[in-house]
């Protein structure tokens, strides 16, 4: 099923320019979105809790900073750009009680809405505007007169029946219309995003990289060569895949590499298929969300342990040395 795609020519920027936008949070996404919106001549304020370390930065960049509940009362569109696990706590206390019909609450990821962490009264719009990339890339591409792909979705219409128009206009203001704005649903965005992170982009890639590195080390190969072959060159291949696709990647590698990839892929696919299906199932049935929210409630014991342990791994120790020349170049 093909998704509807919208470009700059299809979208009215004036819709969002006529409204007051409030950005809750000033991390990498909050900052990038606020700056892009302002450069697109959209009226923007930032909402932060009293004492937030981000207040000086937001003010230095010229934004009016309000406490969250005041921001909500002075905005037409409120974007919740906080970590997923904080949405329930912050929104139930500082946002939802102060909302009125006609307002719109937006998210950059569908997690808290799809997994029923928050809900909104009738007449309040609930939208998704999700840039397909980190805040740093969102800002960099905008400044180059380019953009990132964006996803939009409407979970709940507002009393003005303009939720979709607002979502599209907001995405255009961030540069999304330069590449393409795709319409989906909170469910599809949330579940596919989590799956991509876990099975491929973060969890899957890290597992393959670390296992490859360890396999060569245990077989007696030099650590430096293991790092170059299994970690460093990932970027070269990823760039080819990004810009040219799978077929294009194949065309840019040797016959030896291509034949070897085909031979190695077949047994790996058999192992991965069932594992990936299990990962997706745990996302779909809410098991992952439950585990993650429990982790947050316990103050992140697993994350803290894993982060500490990672610093002591051989792959990180070798990588820190080999990455130094590249860091110097920057």
UniProtKB/Swiss-Prot annotation:
Q: What is this protein called?
A: Ketol-acid reductoisomerase (NADP(+))
KARI C-terminal knotted domain location is 185-329
Q: Which residues bind Mg(2+) 2?
A: 193, 229, 233
Q: Which residues form the KARI N-terminal Rossmann domain?
A: 3-184
Q: Which InterPro entries match?
A: 6-PGluconate_DH-like_C_sf (IPR008927), KARI (IPR013023), KARI_C (IPR000506), KARI_N (IPR013116), KARI_prok (IPR014359), NAD(P)-bd_dom_sf (IPR036291)
Record Gene3D superfamilies = 6.10.240.10, NAD(P)-binding Rossmann-like Domain
Amino-acid positions noted as binding Mg(2+) 1 in the UniProt annotation, renumbered to this chain: 193, 197
Q: What is the lineage of its organism?
A: Bacteria, Pseudomonadati, Campylobacterota, Epsilonproteobacteria, Campylobacterales
Q: Which GO terms describe its molecular function?
A: ketol-acid reductoisomerase activity; magnesium ion binding; NADP binding
């Amino acid at each position: 099923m093909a998704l509807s795609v919208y470009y700059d020519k299809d979208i009215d920027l004036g819709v969002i320019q006529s409204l007051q936008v409030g950005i809750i949070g000033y991390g990498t996404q909050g900052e990038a979105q606020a700056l892009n919106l302002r450069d697109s001549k959209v009226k923007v304020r930032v909402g932060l809790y009293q004492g937030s370390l981000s207040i000086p930065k937001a003010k230095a960049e010229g934004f009016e900073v309000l406490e969250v509940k005041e921001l909500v009362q002075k905005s037409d569109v409120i974007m919740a750009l906080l970590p997923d696990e904080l949405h329930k706590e912050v929104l139930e206390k500082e946002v939802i009680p102060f909302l009125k019909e006609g307002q719109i609450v937006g998210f950059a990821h569908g997690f808290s809405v799809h997994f029923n962490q928050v809900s909104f009264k009738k007449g309040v719009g609930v939208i998704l505007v999700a840039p397909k990339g980190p805040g740093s890339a969102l800002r960099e591409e905008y400044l180059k007169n380019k953009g990132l792909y964006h996803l939009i979705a409407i979970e709940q219409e507002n009393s003005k029946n303009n939720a979709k128009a607002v979502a599209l206009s907001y995405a255009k203001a961030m540069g999304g219309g330069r590449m393409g704005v795709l319409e989906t649903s909170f469910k599809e965005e949330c579940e596919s995003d989590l799956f991509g992170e876990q099975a491929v982009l973060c969890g899957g890639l890290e597992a393959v990289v670390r296992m490859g590195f360890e396999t060569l080390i245990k077989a007696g190969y030099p650590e430096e060569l293991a790092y170059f072959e299994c970690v460093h060159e990932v970027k070269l291949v990823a760039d080819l895949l990004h810009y040219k696709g799978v077929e294009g990647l194949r065309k840019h590698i040797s016959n030896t590499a291509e034949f070897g990839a085909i031979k190695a892929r077949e047994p790996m696919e058999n192992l991965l298929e069932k594992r990936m299906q299990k990962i997706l199932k745990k996302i779909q049935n809410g098991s992952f969300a439950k585990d993650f929210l429990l982790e947050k409630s316990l103050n992140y014991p697993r994350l803290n342990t894993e982060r500490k342990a990672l610093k002591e791994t051989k792959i990180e120790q070798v990588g820190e040395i080999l990455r130094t020349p590249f860091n110097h170049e920057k």
